[in-house]
Amino acid sequence: MMKLKKGKLLIDQHDKNGFWGGKFGGNFVPETLKKPIGDLTVLFERLRRDKNFLKERDYYYTSWVHKGPTPFIKLENLTKYLGGAQVWAKVVSEARGGAHKIYGAITAAMLCKRMGKKFLVTDTGAGYNGKMFSIAGKHFGLKVKVFMGFKDIPFLSFIFDLFNFI
């Protein structure tokens, strides 16, 4: 079991190989992907503390994804049912694309542009992640490649029409 250190971000509590402790963790990737993943890791480590990058990211989050922060609503019935604990929910359905996944897609597209890449690549199960990456990729002028599991395709083939439309 991993012991967390107070006052230190979880993302910084791993060894040089990416292990967070226990029998799981780290990364196990094919040899051909080690360099691209290493390059991405170096860039990410630099940009996650870069005030200009974070300011740009926050601009997209608050001005492009949604005009200002997405709102919260109080869940009155659940609050009453639980006996007084106030329960609130964030209404991310008002964000561009209608899901929270747009935030990760925007950040991935920004990283992709910074690396000089032309393609944004992702996977999707139910289609939301692919949809959000398609929206972000279009905004940043990137081509998008979305992978979906073989067994998911027959049930969600209508999603491909949406990807092509975006």
What do the predicted segments below correspond to?
Residues 1-166:
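PLP-dependent amino-acid enzyme catalytic core
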